[in-house]
Amino acid sequence: MGNRSAADADGLLAGRGPGTGGGAGSPGAAAALVGGVLLIGAVLAGNALVCVSVAAERALQTPTNYFIVSLAAADLLLALLVLPLFVYSEVQGGVWQFSPGLCDALMAMDVMLCTASIFNLCAISADRFVAVAVPLSYNRQSGGGRQLLLIGATWLLSAAVAAPVLCGLNDARGRDPAVCRLEDRDYVVYSSVCSFFLPCPVMLLLYWATFRGLRRWEAARRTKLHGRRPRRPSGPGPPPPEAVETPEAPEAIPTPDATLAEPALPASEERRAKITGRERKAMRVLPVVVGAFLVCWTPFFVVHITGALCPACAVPPRLVSAVTWLGYVNSALNPLIYTVFNAEFRAVFRKALRLCC
């Protein structure tokens, strides 16, 4: 990997360079300060509530929600370690007023936490695909070990992607100390591909295969249910007692906590069926989480890699700043998504708010 300086580019990563704002005391600086404080507060409150809810409520302790807690942890670290310095830089008009070493640490944390978010979403898609493709094998090995292993791998890989920044890669000749950004164009391309452009298609393909498998299983199950229903006699007279139909139990989607159940579950399987229902609810929210992530982060990575691949292209600093803000807003969206689309999260959130207020 080369070490070509990007000093002639305006803020390849987060727009933290001169010209991104109006300077301290300007209306733009005031808006950045108010927006930044609100964003940090929303990210901290929402994601802390997600972690506490899963830890305190047994109904939320499902394999999918283990990954959601890991995702919330990445957002919490972003709000604690990255956003305060980013907001301060925006308030100062994009001028970096701290040491280059702190800038490198900020860039590394920024890359690692964004990468951890997308890798966690990829890990969820891989876990769901295995649960649907080979459910019997998955159930024999269930118990949280696989999920914890995947979560550990996502964080190790994320740290590996970000590590070069802390190993001197960002120390380019002619570096402007008033600008905090990634200085090596080759690394910008490498990190963009590893953090976004490579994992996103893999994740979407796995989700497509997972939900396609679920639809096939549901269709086969409905066919089996229909075939087992007793037929009514063709002649007159009331049907015999055994032919009287009873309301059918709600259908369950196969998940890691239950094998592919038969249409009629015996009493001993009731608890397993309930866990299946919980996991189904957890899976329902995932496409919305993935969609929100792609909407918020795709513009950032497109602008990010364009500035690296096309040095002659003038990427306006304000555009870089705007897409960076949009990406960070995603960290506050996930708790809102869980509240809207998951009744169990909603109930626990209400309970927690009643205790606090």
Swiss-Prot record:
Transmembrane helix among the record's keywords? yes
Residues in compartment: Cytoplasmic = 56-65, 127-146, 209-284, 340-357
The alphabetized UniProt keywords are: Biological rhythms, Cell membrane, Disulfide bond, G-protein coupled receptor, Glycoprotein, Lipoprotein, Membrane, Metal-binding, Palmitate, Receptor, Sodium, Transducer, Transmembrane, Transmembrane helix, Ubl conjugation
Compartments (UniProt record): Cell membrane
TM spans, by residue? 33-55, 66-88, 105-126, 147-170, 187-208, 285-307, 317-339
Which residues are sugar-modified? Answer: N3
Q: Which cysteines are joined by disulfide bonds?
A: C103-C180, C310-C313
Q: Could you name the domain of life of the organism this protein comes from?
A: Eukaryota
Q: What is this protein called?
A: D(4) dopamine receptor
Q: Which organism's genome codes for this protein?
A: Mustela putorius furo (European domestic ferret)
Taxonomic lineage is: Eukaryota, Metazoa, Chordata, Craniata, Vertebrata
